[in-house]
Amino acid sequence: MLLKVLPYLAAMLIAIRTLRDSGLIDRLTALLAPACGAVGMDAELLPLLLLRPFSGSAAMAALADLFESHGPDSGVGYTASVLMGSSETIFYEVALYFGAVGVRRTRFAVPVSLAAMAAGVLTALLLCR
C-alpha cells in the first residue's frame, strides 16, 4: 500500500513546495487582487484559497500568517477561519486515494469537488461580511 501511495504523495509535496518557493503564489495573488475587490473579498485571503485545494499544511501556514498580521479576531482572520473550515484539500485527496486504489480516470470527482468548494467559499464570504 505504501509503495502505491508514496509516489503520488511525494509528487504533490514537491509541487506545493515549488509553487511556494518560486513566488508563483505571490504573482497569482497580485494578478487576481482586482477580481477580489470586485466581489468584496480581501486579497490577503488569496494565498489561503490557492493553497487549500493542494495542501492542508500549506494553507494552515497561510492562515497562521494571516493571524499574525491581522489577528484571529479581525475580519480577515474570521473570514480565513471560516474559509479554512469550508474548503478541502481536493487535489491532495484525489492524488492520494485514487492513486492508492489505481483509479486513472477520476471522471466527475474533481469538477464536482471544485464546484462544492466554490459554493463553500462563496457562502463563507457572504456570511463573513
Predicted regions: what they are:
Residues A61-L66, H70-R129:
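C-terminal transmembrane helix pair
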Residues M1-E68:
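Membrane-embedded alpha-helical segments and adjacent helix-loop junctions characteristic
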